[in-house]
Amino acid sequence: MDFQKAGLRSHEYEIILRELGREPNETELRIFGVMWSEHCSYKSSRPLLKLFPKEGERVLKGVGENAGVVDAGNGWGLAFKVESHNHPSAVEPYQGAATGVGGIIRDILAMGARPIASLDGLFFGNPDSAKTCRLSNGIVKGVGGYGNCVGVPTIGGKTLYDERYEDNPLLNAFCIGLVASGSIVSSQTAEPGNWVVLLGSKTGRDGIGGAAFASVELGEDTKASRPQVQIGDPFVEKLLIEACLEALENGLVTTMQDMGAAGITSSASEIAAKSGVGMILDLDRVPLREEDMVAWEIALSESQERMLLIVRPENLEAVLALGKKWDLDCAVIGETIEGNRFILRKGGEVFADLPASLIGGGCPEISWPAERPRDLDQRQSFDFPTTGFSEDLSRPLLSLIASPSLKEKAWITRQYDSMVQVNTVQGPGAPVSILRIKENGNLVAISMEALPWICSLDPYRGGYETMARSLRPLWVSGAKHLGMTNCLNFPSPENPEQFWEFSEAVKGLADCCRDLSCPVVSGNVSLYNETAGRSIPPTPLVCSVGIIEASCSPLLPGNWKKGDFLFLVGMENASIPGSHFQKFFLKHLSGRPLPPSPQMEADFMERAVMTAAKKLADSAIPLLGGGLAIALGKESIASGIGARISLEFPTHPVAVFFAEGGARALYAVPARNVPEFTRTWKGFPIRQIGLVGGDALCLPQSDPIPLQILANAWKGA
């Protein structure tokens, strides 16, 4: 095998030759090919990721670990991360999605945390195509099948349809776990003289080369890539979770690492490199599922449900007994040593002898050229076509609320168990998912957001708005944000225009995080999401996590009461470009989204959190996809009561009711609280726009929409 077949570039191979002082053998070459792949090394994105603010007063563990951990109060921490499993889900939808869920759960487990909830970002192509139907059904079944069996509730997510995801659907899996602050596990604490223990499933040939496969664009014939997709077993994962947590509770493990991409090689070399130790692994000791596996296959297999433990000699017998108790394979496969050597042996022969730091962190960065797209000015030129749209808003509202990306997703959520562990306060379908932390009485609020249409028109403003829009649901619920994690889904960085979009989106995310003091504690980058030149739109996905103190109650949507006054807070000059209305009705994207307004966001945050803490409103919802009209529609449906809206139009009514962007929310306030509510929002744009009551939603200059008709449209009945 030559270096190019291993996936290495010529300058990378030259570095390897220089550092080793010799040519690598086949096993070593394969190791470098996988460990220096885009998927494992982040060589194209590392320079940009340095822009993210990573420090925060409540950050306990940040970027560089298996997941970030933030302080949840009273001696408890929340470990969380989002990660992609895009290529595998496109090739083998069920297993690709299932193992994506399993992998992110183990990342949380590796921090010493018990996984308590997951969310999933799903991006599909044309909903009417047979291909999308096959892929979406398989992916959703995979998410539900694994999460339900392993006992981790799926409490929310994001689903969006766009024809550009037809060949490259995206699955971004998020998981959050709970850990005692003094029991957080680090991947950087291994010491020489400890045993290396493999716990979990046997090792087979599934998933070999998966990391390298995820680092190139998909071919049109996906069948050939199926062997590179891993096979999951959630029942083994459940046992693995309990075994690992018991080992940690008893102080038997010093370091722990999930075996994901690149398998044993990745987990072992990363621990060695981060901890400053060497490692000798005996591949003959690895429990195998298949016969005649050669050294590099064992070293790079991505078989699921496996963890690598670093164990002090005095704790080894107890760890082996624990494996037996939980009916898991548990084997000593090596030891940690002084120095920087990473050595693989099999049958008495040394198959790899490499510097651990070179494998786990020595891949050089790539500085791709970035060019502003030549057609961007044309894309951003936009005049809203007021002709052709009636001022009657009932028809566009009924059509838009029934559109694929905005309609009810019961066909998805009914396949998920959202209540297992019985801590769910607000589950799928709401702007924010909320969990109860029984250990300290606090509530954790989680939101997931992605805005590919806005990012397509202005990636910087799109990145900024994505971050801000992920935070607003937390604030409206009453939560104070603790941190964020992101998954950066983009096409090939080798295209200068695409890399420019990637760079600008990251800058937008980073600036928003900095402006609003939201640290980035973990994340993932997924590049090369394209097939035969057909690329996905720029899709940075963000998950933000916040906390509601035990003394406060969350402010939830769907609780309108008869006689409540409806208030719109926030800017009226929102944006049609990149909106659901533009995508669904105008069938194309054009124009330039709103510029960021950091002070408006900060003012909104302060007042929204205060409104919830004072219990001034019966119901509240941030204005997200579809704008004011969709917020009114969803609140009417969820509350089972109508409203009469009175609002003057400085522009065409469509531009008022369906525009998106900016710090805006809809509040339902009982009459007794109106004076205090208006005082709380003094100095911020606020308008009373209507009154709750009746059995229809009555918009200005429009036919009343009976609630049953509105609900039927949303549910697709």
Language model region names:
Residues 233, 593-599:
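Catalytic nucleotidyltransferase
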Residues 30-239, 245-248, 254, 269-273, ...:
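Glycine-rich phosphate/pyrophosphate-binding loop regions near the starts of catalytic domains
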Residues 1-6, 10, 16-29, 167-169, ...:
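Glycine-/charge-enriched secondary-structure boundary and capping motifs
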